[in-house]
């Protein structure tokens, strides 16, 4: 006699390269929303995965799989975005329900962009390969969010649903709330039980699990649950995987959290049982909107990286989810390269020269804690030469990228704070390390390098009125002006004035 799982596997064997949503369909819990910038989630899907907008002329284009059911056409993105910046403006729904994710509007909390909207994600912050083919995930800095408040077919009230997401288990924080899933249609907090979304992070304000985090939890509104009880649940382990599969499902008086390494192995069940015994959570009052990277009320202080995810109609069986996990592992997610162009070498000492016409005698330097540009040459004072010289070290937050230590103030590094570049002493915190890590890429104007913030990949080293900022190509800050952006973010790497 065949088990349900064996029957499911036999049924799928007749389907060439069945995708996650084919597997859910075979398990009688079809996808009602399917989002990914890396690959098709149905074997037959060949439509648009996501939309890009480039900074040079605000033109948009869509990126589709190379073949039906295949990997995203990263080369089309690279060509479209060459010598400029690109944002991900839409993440398309592959299910046919039109549940596309777009820039999240203001709600209980305003976002940092124009009119209170959240920021859009850089198109190049999360490069990966799937089975050796290049693709890009969605690297979401604090303030970034996507949403659909008019979704079709998603669970409402106490209806059953399932969901999974493939996330970066090393990119997180303790702010509210890096979510993917079901939320309020008003972008406001309408009470306990009005959400059911995957959360990844190390917040301990509501629930938390074993160790120091991060944890997969469920955001049910007004609480993050790691198990049956509010607060601590020992069965929810800390996550250490670079690529994480997070799976959540909920129905009438039942719900579950499951998780796994998305690169190998099988799903583990961290909780499966009755709804929390607190007011508002049984029955649930789900509203059916879809969020990514934010809380239901547009809380937008969290960070994380999203590669793919779906929401289903009905409560998926463990066997169905196990088969989806096998499919994810078979996709072979591997970290891609964050750097391009002229290379830095850890341990070398450099000076960085401005390339903007009319300013090419100026170098990145500092005056006390202010990072600025100053005119420097061989006749300058020893003090100024040292202030304009930087020791390159392996990135404090990411070993692919780099941090820049002051020659004249050892132990102090260039970091961004409120998007100004400052010279501050390394305090050893995760926040400082992320603020002080920058990824070089081929200069946007073709001269040298452009230095992109690892933690805010829409933002680059930019000189503006002779002061250095972490600036975006267009934005709400004065120093985000598009005028001369490519020149202002491009620097020649030269032999240091001092060492």
Curated annotation (Swiss-Prot):
Molecular function in Gene Ontology: alpha-L-arabinofuranosidase activity
Q: Where in the cell is it found?
A: Secreted
Glycosylation sites noted in the Swiss-Prot or TrEMBL record: 83, 202
Q: Which family does it belong to?
A: Belongs to the glycosyl hydrolase 54 family.
ABD: annotated segments: 336-499
Leader peptide range in chain numbering = 1-17
Outcome reported for the amino acid change (mutating residue 221 to A): Impairs catalytic activity
Provide the active-site residues from the annotation: 221 (nucleophile), 297 (proton donor)
Q: Name one GO cellular component term.
A: extracellular region
How does this protein's activity vary with temperature? Optimum temperature is 55 degrees Celsius.
pH dependence, record text: Optimum pH is 4.0. Stable between pH 3.0 and 7.0.
Statement: the UniProt record of this protein carries the keyword Glycoprotein: yes
Full protein name:
Alpha-L-arabinofuranosidase B
Question: Which CDD domains does the record associate with it?
Answer: beta-trefoil_ABD_ABFB
Q: Which gene encodes it?
A: abfB
Disulfide feature? 21-31, 81-86, 176-177, 401-439
Q: Which conditions up-regulate this protein?
A: Expressed in the presence of L-arabitol and L-arabinose, and repressed in the presence of sucrose and glucose.
Catalytic reaction annotation:
Hydrolysis of terminal non-reducing alpha-L-arabinofuranoside residues in alpha-L-arabinosides
Q: In which pathway does it act?
A: Glycan metabolism; L-arabinan degradation
State the SUPFAM superfamilies in the record. Answer: AbfB domain (SSF110221), Concanavalin A-like lectins/glucanases (SSF49899)
Quick one: where's region Catalytic? 18-335
Q: Write down the top EC class of this protein.
A: hydrolase
Domain observations: Organized into two domains: an N-terminal catalytic domain and a C-terminal arabinose-binding domain (ABD).
**Which UniProt key words apply to this protein?**
Carbohydrate metabolism, Disulfide bond, Glycoprotein, Glycosidase, Hydrolase, Polysaccharide degradation, Secreted, Signal, Xylan degradation
Which chain positions carry the site (Cis-peptide bond)? 176-177
